């Protein structure tokens, strides 16, 4: 497993996407264009809203990002599900960073609120994930609340984001 650091750059996140960070069969980020994170600015096993750990990350929005031309033609908006997926990506990364074994999968979320949009003129997305608990059993399960800011304005909130790590590779 890679050294446990408190921040990660883009090349390190790509290495995680190739399965090189946490070892074969363990937590892995998606590769571009589905990778919704450009850097992890802070990660800690303690602190956060529930004092169970947190992660902060950023994504640089570009006017030519792949989703703008198709969602929607003449009215470009980043699909909200991509921001939500970024929250799940970070939740899974945290579990791998803790050294937990298994392949990651998004399982569910509680409530999701969309209060704004990501447009081509948006410059920076900031993610915040605050962990409520990590349960270790047959499946390692991380539960967290998350938020997303666009150029400093809170636009998405999600409660009870759940990501599991399974040694078998599925949640079943």
From Swiss-Prot:
User: What range does the record give for the signal peptide?
Assistant: none
Q: Which InterPro entries match?
A: FabA (IPR010083), FabA_FabZ (IPR013114), HotDog_dom_sf (IPR029069)
Q: Where would you say this protein principally sits, based on its record? A: cytoplasm
Q: Give the annotated active site.
A: 71
Q: Which residues form a coiled coil?
A: none
Q: GO terms for molecular function, please?
A: (3R)-hydroxyacyl-[acyl-carrier-protein] dehydratase activity; trans-2-decenoyl-acyl-carrier-protein isomerase activity
Q: Name one GO biological process term.
A: unsaturated fatty acid biosynthetic process
Q: Where in the cell is it found?
A: Cytoplasm
Q: What is its EC number?
A: 4.2.1.59, 5.3.3.14
CC per GO annotation: cytoplasm
Domain of life of the organism encoding this protein: Bacteria
Sorted alphabetically, which HAMAP family does this protein's record hold? FabA
Membership in a protein family: Belongs to the thioester dehydratase family. FabA subfamily.
Q: How does it assemble?
A: Homodimer.
Which protein is depicted? Answer: 3-hydroxydecanoyl-[acyl-carrier-protein] dehydratase
């Amino acid at each position: 497993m890679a050294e446990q650091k408190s921040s990660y750059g883009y090349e390190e996140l790509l290495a995680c996407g190739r399965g090189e960070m946490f070892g074969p069969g363990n937590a892995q980020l998606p590769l571009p264009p589905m990778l919704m994170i450009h850097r992890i600015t802070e990660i800690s096993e303690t602190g956060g809203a529930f004092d169970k750990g947190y992660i902060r990350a950023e994504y640089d929005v570009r006017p030519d990002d792949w989703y703008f031309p198709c969602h929607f033609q003449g009215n470009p908006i980043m699909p909200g599900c991509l921001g939500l997926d970024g929250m799940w990506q970070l939740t899974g990364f945290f579990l791998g960073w803790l050294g937990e074994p298994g392949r990651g999968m998004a399982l569910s979320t509680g409530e999701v609120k969309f209060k704004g949009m990501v447009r081509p003129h948006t410059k920076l997305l900031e993610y915040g994930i605050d962990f409520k608990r990590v349960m270790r059993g047959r499946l390692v399960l991380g539960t967290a609340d998350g938020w997303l800011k666009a150029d400093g304005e809170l636009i998405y909130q999600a409660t009870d984001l759940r990501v599991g790590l399974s040694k078998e590779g599925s949640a079943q």
